[in-house]
């Protein structure tokens, strides 16, 4: 399941984020690469311990946890703190699958979901599409600044070469309360239907029944 969430941050907020990011010292992006990815990855990143990156990453996590569509789709249990990357001058990241397990200051997490928050407007760079291959085929993603895409970490994906301009983004992984992608998709679809019926002022008893089904499925499938 691939979910696009528009306007997680406003244009003004993105501009403020970029002012802070652009002033920092960027390093070789292979800092977070797995062994096989190092030959495919050419980009720049902020050090994960950079104080500005840490503060902005926390701001992103706080915003996402307050975003109903994100919470409904991801059912987040634990984040790998957001990182920041930059592509320019032909830099790229060839096809790869994200590492299944990552270490955080609080221990290990299983990477169920990956997310990219775009921080450059698409018209400001050529190339740089996030291309994701999943069960529904190949999808090419290039969203407006402040928008986010969420997708299974098991997906084969790449960032195509940035031929001109500059592509800046935040990226992150998270462990979901529900490990299985198919189960997460069903829960998301059910929750979205409940929200739609609530807005349409559907019969209270039917909403009560559907909400009960949702929570009982979540109770059955979640791992905490």
Curated annotation (Swiss-Prot):
Q: Which GO terms describe its molecular function?
A: 2-oxoglutarate-dependent dioxygenase activity; iron ion binding; L-ascorbic acid binding
> Which SUPFAM superfamilies does the annotation name?
Clavaminate synthase-like (SSF51197)
For the ligand (2-oxoglutarate), the binding residues are 167
One Pfam family for this entry, by name?
PKHD_C
> Which segments constitute the Fe2OG dioxygenase domain?
78-176
Keywords, sorted A to Z = Dioxygenase, Iron, Metal-binding, Oxidoreductase, Vitamin C
Gene Ontology BP term (one): intracellular iron ion homeostasis
What cofactor does its activity depend on?
A: Fe(2+); L-ascorbate
Q: Which domain of life is it from?
A: Bacteria
Write out the residues that bind Fe cation.
96, 98, 157
> How and how many cofactors are bound, per the record note?
Binds 1 Fe(2+) ion per subunit.
Q: Transmembrane as a keyword?
A: no
The EC number(s) given in the record are: 1.14.11.-
PANTHER family per the UniProt record, alphabetical = PKHD-TYPE HYDROXYLASE YBIX
Record-given protein name:
PKHD-type hydroxylase Sbal223_0741
Source organism per UniProt: Shewanella baltica (strain OS223)
């Amino acid at each position: 399941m691939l979910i696009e969430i528009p306007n997680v941050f406003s244009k003004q907020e993105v501009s403020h984020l970029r002012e802070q990011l652009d002033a920092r010292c960027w390093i070789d992006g292979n800092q977070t690469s797995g062994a096989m990815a190092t030959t495919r990855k050419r980009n720049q990143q902020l050090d994960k311990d950079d104080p500005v990156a840490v503060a902005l990453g926390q701001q992103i996590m706080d915003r996402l946890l307050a975003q109903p569509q994100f919470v409904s789709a991801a059912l987040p249990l634990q984040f790998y703190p957001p990182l920041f990357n930059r592509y320019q001058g032909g830099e790229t990241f060839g096809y790869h699958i994200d590492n299944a397990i990552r270490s955080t200051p609080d221990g290990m997490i299983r990477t169920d979901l990956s997310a990219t928050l775009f921080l450059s407007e698409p018209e400001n760079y050529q190339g740089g599409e996030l291309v994701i291959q999943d069960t529904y085929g190949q999808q090419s993603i290039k969203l407006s600044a402040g928008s986010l895409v969420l997708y299974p970490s098991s997906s084969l994906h790449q960032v195509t070469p940035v031929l001109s301009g500059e592509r800046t983004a935040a990226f992150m992984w998270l462990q979901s309360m529900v490990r299985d992608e198919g189960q997460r998709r069903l829960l998301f679809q059910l929750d979205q239907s409940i929200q739609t019926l609530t807005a349409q002022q559907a019969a209270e008893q039917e909403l009560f029944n559907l909400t009960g089904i949702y929570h009982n499925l979540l109770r059955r499938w979640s791992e905490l």
